[in-house]
């Protein structure tokens, strides 16, 4: 495969959906739509305790700031945000990029409806339902792909990686953050025994080495 795509920015931290798996993921995010933002942004004491206990106090607000910092404030190309989720972290940044063309995709209509409430009034942003494993986009048509807190939900991650690579222009950037298996036994237990069974996470999950190997086969430069 070609290696022209320039760089991948990784901060530690759909895809051929069919049958029961698709329903499971859809239902999981429908039931969590009212608490999703609260958990990620740690708006209340319960979400703060959950993050501290199971995610080693990871601050998603800080991670989001670091991820979005890789997108220049004067960015004017084509940008793909997948999955967009509720756009709780990206609303301000995407709204400010008036000269860009931004496509926000999510498989979950419940997540997408909330994103549309935040972003729908901006002419340079479109929010559409879609499958990252089968992106309805031309080859080499996107300058930057951002994937924030979403890869863990993709059951066919191999297709997701390939589709993102396919739509990126040579020299384009893939900016993402991932759940990485093997960093915390407590987190791994939570993911395996609760989050995956409920449909919020979908195996397989990569270790840092496995993820690095995947990316280095696709991209000329990886920054982990």
Question: What is the predicted role of each segment?
Answer:
Residues 78-134:
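Class I SAM-dependent methyltransferase SAM/SAH-binding core
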Residues 144-156:
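A short SAM/SAH-binding and catalytic strip from SAM-dependent methyltransferases
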């Amino acid at each position: 495969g070609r290696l022209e795509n320039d760089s991948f920015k990784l901060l530690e931290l759909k895809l051929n959906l069919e049958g029961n798996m698709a329903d499971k993921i859809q239902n999981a995010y429908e039931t969590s739509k009212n608490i999703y933002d609260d958990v990620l942004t740690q708006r209340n004491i319960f979400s703060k305790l959950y993050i501290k206990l199971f995610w080693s106090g990871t601050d998603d607000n800080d991670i989001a700031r670091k991820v979005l910092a890789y997108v220049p404030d004067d960015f004017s190309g084509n940008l793909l945000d997948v999955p967009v989720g509720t756009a709780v972290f990206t609303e301000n940044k995407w709204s400010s990029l008036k000269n860009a063309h931004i496509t926000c995709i999510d498989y979950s209509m419940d997540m997408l409806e909330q994103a549309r409430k935040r972003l729908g009034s901006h002419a340079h942003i479109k929010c559409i339902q879609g499958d990252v494993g089968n992106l309805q986009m031309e080859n080499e048509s996107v300058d930057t792909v951002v994937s924030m807190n979403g890869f863990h939900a993709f059951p066919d991650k191999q297709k997701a990686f390939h589709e993102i690579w396919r739509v990126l222009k040579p020299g384009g950037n893939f900016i993402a953050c991932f759940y990485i298996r093997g960093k915390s036994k407590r987190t791994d237990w939570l993911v395996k025994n609760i989050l995956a069974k409920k449909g919020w996470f979908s195996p397989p999950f990569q270790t840092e080495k496995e993820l690095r190997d995947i990316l280095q086969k696709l991209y000329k430069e990886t920054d982990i």
